[in-house]
Amino acid sequence: MQTIPARIRWAVDFMDVKPSDHLLEIGCGPGAGAELICSRLETGRLFAIDRSESGVDRTKRRCASYIKAGRLTVRQIDLATLRVPVKRLNKVFAFNVNLFWVRECADEVALLHERVLPGGGVYLFYESTRPEQVPEMIRKASASLTEGGFRVYVVDSKDPAVVGIIGRR
């Protein structure tokens, strides 16, 4: 396993990935989150997406063994146009994905609410290295999830500097 940044490790540990979980990762980037999540799956699966071709390529290279084993599918697509192949998800993971606090995202949140199982969750994590942005991130992302039918709570870590906005279904 390649080096996993502390912020990603903290977020994935917080999600408490179970071996049978079905997850969606939004914005897989270099694949660190996907690698760590897949290392915890047995019968579960991860569907990872990114709008960036380079992000998808990096994740595919980094996680080739998990793709071959059938635990990971990676696609270049935007959440707004996604048709999730998994009927039901236990968890949705996103790290530093600005969609949920910088623009209107009711359609995307509705899609997630439709796909996340009762008791499941949407886990939006952000580096909180810019403290002046954190209150706005929390307020806007929380509002997006609440308006979409999720029960929201916030978690905060000082080391690593991460804030999480968690929406439970």
Predicted region positions:
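Conserved SAM/SAH-binding beta-strand->alpha-helix loop
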Residues: 52
